[in-house]
A protein has these predicted regions:
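Acidic, glycine/polar-enriched metal-coordinating patches/loops
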Residues: 1-117
Length: 117
């Protein structure tokens, strides 16, 4: 689990998936009120060879998604991915006290599924 600090404008973190893994990687906001903006998105490419490759884009809901949980191959646990986190606001949207914008490309396998939670 990596817990981000409270979002503030200008904070910027990048995470590289340097090895395929099993288990769970979770990228969490500092609290349930530090959410990912509704424009936050992750593109998950199927890791298979060209010709069988597909991709799916997933967005945070902008209301209560405060975690990215990669706990299955379908959610991007394969080597080569990257996730960027940019602090965009304090005082946020709705009940949020802080907002992160997240984007990235990760690699999964099978029936690709959202890692936002």
């Amino acid at each position: 689990v990596v817990t981000l600090p409270t979002a503030a404008a200008g904070l910027n973190y990048s995470f590289i998936i340097g090895t395929t893994f099993t288990g769970t990687f979770s990228l969490d906001g500092a609290s349930a009120n530090d959410i990912y903006s509704s424009s936050s998105n992750l593109l998950i490419w199927d890791k298979d060879a060209p010709g069988t490759v597909s991709a799916k884009q997933f967005y945070a809901d902008g209301s209560d998604d405060d975690k990215i949980v990669m706990d299955a191959d379908t959610k991007g646990r394969f080597v080569g991915g990257r996730i960027n986190c940019i602090g965009i606001a304090t005082g946020g949207q709705g009940s949020a006290t802080a907002v992160w914008h997240v984007d990235g490309i990760v690699y999964g396998d099978g029936s690709l599924a959202t890692p936002f939670a």
